[in-house]
């Protein structure tokens, strides 16, 4: 038995395609999106609509509040529990989403062996406060491989990598390779040519604005959720907050959301290219109807192995 993980960049069309595919083969979707886990954040995370979620049962959406902590280790544990529940009911589970870190947690396993040390974390945060950028330089020197996988602005993961090194004397990138993988999964990636994908991203952002993204952010702030939360630094939310604080005008806000989403999509594609064994479908050149038929066949046949 092999379970499909269907990944790809944001706005490529994963949700619409996979809802139709899963509906026809009697499958349920396990979301693999690190932002759709948050309640109240619907428009900016492009969650499936209530109607779509009625057509196909979705798991791992709306599971925590925006101020709750969550990581890839927790996702792996919770989503595997959801997967087992789907299997018990005689259905086919299909993972769908663009969070490469979650795909890694499922396929390659995840290292979570060193307990957090608040003293070390406090020390590192203070060091960064005194000399911005110093932790990134330290990571590049101590663990170059981890530095290539951790975004320069991701202070939380940078601190975690340095914390592990300081506690164990070993690089987190080495320890992660020792994590136990899971051979029950296979990966499918949906993609499009850059020009088409970027056009779809721009249209999606325009639609989010029309649907009330600014009001959604205002509502979240009104509920008491801090702009400094990890959830509120999601692309779309961060730019709206800066706009509301008067850092730039409305048009600049829209421009930045589009630009940052395009950059994010490019990073997603690069991430999934690391899976040499993945099956890729380019929706710019392949007929979408034919791709759906191929997906149905591939998912069902692998599940039946």
Curated annotation (Swiss-Prot):
Keywords: ATP-binding, Magnesium, Nucleotide-binding, Transferase, tRNA processing. GO terms for molecular function: ATP binding; tRNA dimethylallyltransferase activity. ATP binds at residues 8-15. Its cofactor is Mg(2+). The record marks 99, 121 as: Interaction with substrate tRNA. Its EC number is 2.5.1.75. Substrate binds at residues 10-15. It catalyses: adenosine(37) in tRNA + dimethylallyl diphosphate = N(6)-dimethylallyladenosine(37) in tRNA + diphosphate. Residues 33-36 are annotated as: Interaction with substrate tRNA. One of its GO terms (biological process) is tRNA modification. Belongs to the IPP transferase family. Catalyzes the transfer of a dimethylallyl group onto the adenine at position 37 in tRNAs that read codons beginning with uridine, leading to the formation of N6-(dimethylallyl)adenosine (i(6)A). NCBIfam families: miaA. HAMAP family: IPP_trans. Monomer. This is tRNA dimethylallyltransferase. It comes from Thermotoga maritima (strain ATCC 43589 / DSM 3109 / JCM 10099 / NBRC 100826 / MSB8). The gene is miaA.
């Amino acid at each position: 038995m092999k379970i499909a993980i269907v990944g790809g960049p944001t706005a490529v069309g994963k949700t619409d395609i996979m809802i139709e595919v899963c509906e026809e083969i009697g499958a349920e979707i396990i979301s693999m999106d690190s932002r759709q886990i948050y309640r109240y954040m619907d428009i900016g995370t492009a969650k499936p609509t209530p109607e779509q979620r009625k057509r196909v049962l979705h798991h791992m959406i709306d599971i925590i509040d925006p101020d709750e902590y969550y990581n890839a280790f927790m996702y792996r544990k919770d989503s595997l529990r959801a997967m087992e529940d789907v299997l018990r009911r005689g259905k086919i589970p299909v993972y769908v989403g663009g969070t490469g870190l979650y795909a890694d947690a499922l396929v390659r396993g995840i290292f979570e062996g060193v307990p957090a040390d608040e003293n070390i974390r406090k020390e590192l945060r203070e060091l960064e406060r005194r000399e911005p950028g110093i932790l990134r330089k330290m990571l590049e020197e101590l663990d170059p491989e981890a530095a290539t996988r951790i975004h320069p602005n991701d202070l939380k993961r940078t601190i975690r990598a340095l914390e592990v090194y300081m506690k164990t004397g070993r690089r987190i990138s080495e320890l992660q390779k020792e994590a136990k993988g899971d051979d029950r999964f296979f990966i499918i990636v949906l993609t499009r040519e850059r020009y088409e994908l970027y056009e779809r991203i721009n249209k999606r952002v325009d639609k989010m604005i029309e649907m009330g993204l600014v009001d959604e952010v205002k509502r979240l702030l009104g509920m008491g959720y801090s702009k400094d939360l990890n959830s509120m630094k999601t692309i779309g939310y961060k730019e709206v907050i800066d706009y509301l604080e008067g850092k730039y005008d409305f048009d600049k806000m829209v421009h930045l959301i589009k630009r940052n989403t395009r950059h994010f999509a490019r990073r997603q594609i690069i991430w999934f290219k690391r899976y040499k064994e993945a099956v890729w479908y380019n929706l710019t050149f392949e007929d979408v109807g034919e791709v759906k038929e191929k997906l149905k066949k591939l998912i069902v046949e692998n599940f039946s192995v």
